[in-house]
Amino acid sequence: LSQYWGKGDTRSIRSILSIMYRVTLALSLLFTAAARFFPELILSLFSSDPLVIAAGSRYLALVCFSYTLNGMTNVMLMSLRSVGTVGISILVYSSSFFANTALNWVLIFGKLGFPALGMEGAAIATIIARALELTIASVYLFGFEKKIGYTLRDVAVYDRSFAKDFAINVTPVM
């Protein structure tokens, strides 16, 4: 993206972003499905303790719903940083940090009238924090950002030449 920004080619930046959203969506949904339907199998790769696997599976089966939210937010913020807009990342991640911390306190321990949910509460807090991140980043990108000029209409644009270049240049890195 930075090379296109240096050339002032915002059309190409928008095309690449659309491809990145598609790839991120596909991969995050794949990982979400794996974590949702096979949490025990995934955790058994890291631990043989049945108590750890059982507890971790409950958490993983919930927190996996944050993967797509996190992926989309990261694409937005990475693109903004590529064109020199870095302040929004600080706002997004600071807001998320404080929201997640507060929600963890409330949902894990059952404060402010909420039931104590333990690990499930931590997963729910994480999902809410990731939704907050995506909301703030989306409002900024689609409502206030003027350098790239990315709109909701651009999400549907598919440029085959950029898709081919993207696959050639990005696949080895992945």
Region annotations inferred by a language model:
Residues V63-M76:
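Hydrophobic alpha-helical transmembrane segments of polytopic membrane proteins
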Residues T24, S79-V106, A123-I127:
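Alpha-helical transmembrane segments of multi-pass membrane transporters/permeases
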Residues T73, L103, E133-I136:
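Membrane-embedded alpha-helical transmembrane segments of multi-pass integral membrane proteins
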Residues L1-S66, F114-T171:
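Short alpha-helical transmembrane segments in multi-pass integral membrane proteins
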